[in-house]
Amino acid sequence: MEKMSRQLPLNPTFIPPPYGVLRSLLENPLKLPLHPEDAFSKDRDKGKKLDDGSNSPTVPQSAFLGPTLWDKTLPYDGDTFQLEYMDLEEFLSENGIPPSPSQHDHSPHPPGLQPASSTAPSVMDLSSRATAPLHPGIPSPNCMQNPIRPGQLLPANRNTPSPIDPDTIQVPVGYEPDPADLALSSIPGPEMFDPRKRKFSEEELKPQPMIKKARKVFIPDDLKDDKYWARRRKNNMAAKRSRDARRLKENQIAIRASFLEKENSALRQEVADLRKELGKCKNILAKYEARHGPL
């Protein structure tokens, strides 16, 4: 069945003036009724009143009594005319207008009592909105530029670790030197020799040459005076101090070498364990690359 289209009759009270349609619409706005039946009944009543009344039509006037915008003349002077900067966010917040319709729909507060923080989005919100895709099915440009391969995990922290001082590393070594050897390797005093911290310079570790004894010179008894015996005692004390210092240094080097041997064996065992663990990791990585491709 074909639906009969019925045309609405024009309002006979509306007479377009000769000076423009836009101005006439602004001055004389039309109000369309909600129900077409009421419009037909009102048009019939108005037609009867117009037939009974005078033939001169009356132009309806606008309800606004103030001056119209086009009747005003703004003073313009090229020297004094200046443009003022206006912040859009501030203007919207002062007038209680939300910057986006989503905030206006979901805001529980009235427009005049909205906090300023809700009307001005932060930089983080703008960055998140820029990175988020417009539609759920369309990926963002950043995802297209940096594709994530299957199985690839992004590290939570990319910062490189701070450098470690090798001297601060403590290797667990089960080494306990003999207290008697420590006493022979320590200088008389409160501080004891520590083979874990004591380091020797290259000069101290150089091989010492063999000291040859000087050939004895025979001196008759009548020439052995007090000056001779004083010089003899002085030389003997210097030789004794030299022997004690050399023996002390040899004992320290021996205890230090014993500790380094223990530490070397512990480090070798640790390196062997690390190599075994590295071999397992390489095997797992090779199996993963064979199944999913290279990383």
Curated annotation (Swiss-Prot):
Tissue expression pattern: Isoform HLF43 is abundant in brain, liver and kidney. Isoform HLF36 is expressed only in the liver. Both isoforms accumulate in the liver with different circadian amplitudes. Isoform HLF36 reaches peak expression levels between 8 and 12 p.m. Isoform HLF43 displays a more pronounced fluctuation through the day.
One GO MF term: DNA-binding transcription factor activity, RNA polymerase II-specific
Annotated spans, Disordered: 34-69, 93-160
bZIP domain residues: 225-288
Protein family membership: Belongs to the bZIP family. PAR subfamily.
UniProt keyword Transcription regulation present: yes
A biological-process GO annotation: regulation of transcription by RNA polymerase II
Species assigned in the record: Rattus norvegicus (Rat)
Protein's UniProt name: Hepatic leukemia factor
Keyword hit for Calcium: no
Compartment(s): Nucleus
The gene coding this protein: Hlf
Pfam family, one: bZIP_2
Compositional bias annotation for Basic and acidic residues: 34-52
Alphabetical keyword list: Biological rhythms, DNA-binding, Nucleus, Transcription, Transcription regulation
Region feature Basic motif, mapped onto this chain: 227-247
